[in-house]
């Protein structure tokens, strides 16, 4: 993100790409302005939260008018560094890793997986989704400073060991899909996504909703 942007809550930062994607669709349809209520309906975030999110960046809209789509799109493009491609390395070409390589963020043109690593000799030296797969032993030789982000879809026991090597190579951010909780220096940002935990959480809330609907 732009170094000049204000410090904002993590929850707000996570919603910015949602706003940006919807604004791109609005712009493509030729719409010139949008209200917080319309944004709310599209991204499933209440209008008050949207207005609060936008307030961190100053006056982005006018009361009674709403928001100028072109202006917002341009603003968030700069805020999210959409004009620059962020190269990503993926570790672990199993089922989940293969799905990532085939998808490769086709709806997000500024993010691209450019290389993958695995230890399976049947996968090493080949391409998956047009992305070359290297042996994990080649990490130090292949990974360069232009790749700031790594995705981990490896077995949990290997996650910390690979992370330590990534830190040594100057990686800045890790999207961790393993159950392992990684130990990294403070300047490294890690987002943990445990699919089992997310599913259990969803099932829990479904159970709670069903309980209250029966009362």
Curated annotation (Swiss-Prot):
NAD(+) binds at residues 92-97. Signal peptide: none annotated. The keyword Transcription regulation applies. GO terms for biological process: negative regulation of DNA-templated transcription; response to redox state. Pfam families: CoA_binding, Put_DNA-bind_N. Homodimer. Modulates transcription in response to changes in cellular NADH/NAD(+) redox state. This is Redox-sensing transcriptional repressor Rex. It comes from Geobacillus sp. (strain WCH70). The gene is rex.
